[in-house]
Amino acid sequence: METSSLETLPHLPALRRGRPYDSLEKTEIVDHSTGKVVAVVSQVNAGILKKDLQRIDEGRAALRKFTVAELIEISAKAGELFLNGTLPLGDRGHTQSADEYVRTLSGTSGLPHVMVRRNMAKIHYALTHVGTVL
């Protein structure tokens, strides 16, 4: 695929210490039936992970700014948005609805839509019941 057309596709950056990171190392995500590239994902190697783990206390400090109840509420809201909302997709201004997520994941993984929806329901349940799990 041409570079210019790759630049219009959704790009999912790696996250480093809570911030998007546009890595030089990228993987193209392909629809299994059409062979069409549908997104590009930044990846990081073990060296970068090791470097970031040395600063893990920064992440802990950021989480300590919230109460447990606030984190549970944030998780529940995330679960609702995941199952029912339209969310940002990557760092190039794309968005994706839950139905689009089902079609995309089914197309790139080969899983039937019904299986993707079941897994979405499980993720939703886990996120909206964090308080019960804890």
Features from the language model and the residues they span:
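N-terminal Rossmann-like NAD(P)+-binding subdomain of aldehyde/semialdehyde dehydrogenases
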Residues: M1-L134
